Swiss-Prot record:
<keyword id="KW-0690">Ribosome biogenesis</keyword>
<feature type="compositionally biased region" description="Acidic residues">
    <location>
        <begin position="147"/>
        <end position="159"/>
    </location>
</feature>
<feature type="region of interest" description="Not required for interaction with Der/Enga">
    <location>
        <begin position="1"/>
        <end position="45"/>
    </location>
</feature>
<feature type="compositionally biased region" description="Basic residues">
    <location>
        <begin position="31"/>
        <end position="40"/>
    </location>
</feature>
<keyword id="KW-0343">GTPase activation</keyword>
<comment type="function">
    <text>A GTPase-activating protein (GAP) that modifies Der/EngA GTPase function, negatively regulating cell growth, probably via ribosome assembly. Stimulates the GTPase activity of Der; a construct missing the first 45 residues is even more stimulatory. Does not stimulate 2 other GTPases (ObgE and Era). Overexpression inhibits cell growth; precursor 16S rRNA accumulates, the 23S rRNA is 6-7 bases longer than usual, and 50S ribosomal subunits are improperly assembled, leading to 45S subunits lacking proteins L9, L18 and L25.</text>
</comment>
<feature type="region of interest" description="Disordered">
    <location>
        <begin position="144"/>
        <end position="169"/>
    </location>
</feature>
<dbReference type="Pfam" id="PF04220">
    <property type="entry name" value="YihI"/>
</dbReference>
<protein>
    <recommendedName>
        <fullName>Der GTPase-activating protein YihI</fullName>
    </recommendedName>
</protein>
<dbReference type="InterPro" id="IPR007336">
    <property type="entry name" value="YihI"/>
</dbReference>
<feature type="region of interest" description="Asp/Glu rich">
    <location>
        <begin position="148"/>
        <end position="157"/>
    </location>
</feature>
<dbReference type="GO" id="GO:0005096">
    <property type="term" value="F:GTPase activator activity"/>
</dbReference>
<dbReference type="GO" id="GO:0005829">
    <property type="term" value="C:cytosol"/>
</dbReference>
<feature type="compositionally biased region" description="Basic and acidic residues">
    <location>
        <begin position="160"/>
        <end position="169"/>
    </location>
</feature>
<feature type="compositionally biased region" description="Basic residues">
    <location>
        <begin position="10"/>
        <end position="19"/>
    </location>
</feature>
<feature type="region of interest" description="Arg/Lys rich">
    <location>
        <begin position="17"/>
        <end position="45"/>
    </location>
</feature>
<feature type="region of interest" description="Disordered">
    <location>
        <begin position="1"/>
        <end position="98"/>
    </location>
</feature>
Length: 169
């Protein structure tokens, strides 16, 4: 009362069928054909490689053999060397003209007014004002001018006035 062995095998899993010599030979030929096809397609260099995208004008890789379209002179020509222009230097002003420019400088006047009003300037502005005031002092010394001349004249006038008053004239 054993179940038949042939029925149980057919229902469970079938025995692996052996391939014939012809089938094995056919598979070998297919593998050899696939192996031959490895690498680039014939004529890929001339045709430009694989162009899977339909639009050739956009995003298509350029042919590396096609170069620039700019004309190249074939004869020997002398190169024209361009002279480098020196940077235009600031024109040298006379001390008198430079002093007048500094005295009429709007930025300097505005910053000095801010200082007189009690505002504090940034370090950059303060250093700029100091440099300009130092330059004004240098120019005034070169020209023989000083702020003290005006003050001395006023003091001399005051002294003379005092002397007149004391003398009683």
């Amino acid at each position: 009362m054993k179940p038949s062995s042939s029925n149980s095998r057919s229902k469970g899993h079938a025995k692996a069928r052996r391939k014939t010599r012809e089938e094995l030979d056919q598979e070998a030929r297919d593998r050899k054909r696939q192996k031959k096809r490895r690498g680039h397609a014939p004529g890929s260099r001339a045709a430009g490689g694989n162009t899977t995208s339909g639009s050739k004008g956009q995003n298509a890789p350029k042919d590396p053999r096609i170069g620039s379209k700019t004309p190249i002179p074939l004869g020997v020509t002398e190169k024209v060397t361009k002279q480098h222009k020196p940077k235009s230097e600031k024109p040298m002003l006379s001390p008198q003209a430079e002093l007048e420019l500094l005295e009429t400088d709007e930025r300097l006047d505005a910053l000095l007014e801010r200082l007189e009003a009690g505002e504090t300037l940034s370090a950059e502005e303060q250093s700029w004002v100091d440099a300009k005031l130092d330059r004004i002092d240098e120019l005034m010394q070169k020209l023989g001018l000083s702020y003290d001349d005006d003050e001395e004249e006023e003091e001399d006038e005051k002294q003379e006035d005092m002397m007149r008053l004391l003398r009683g004239n």
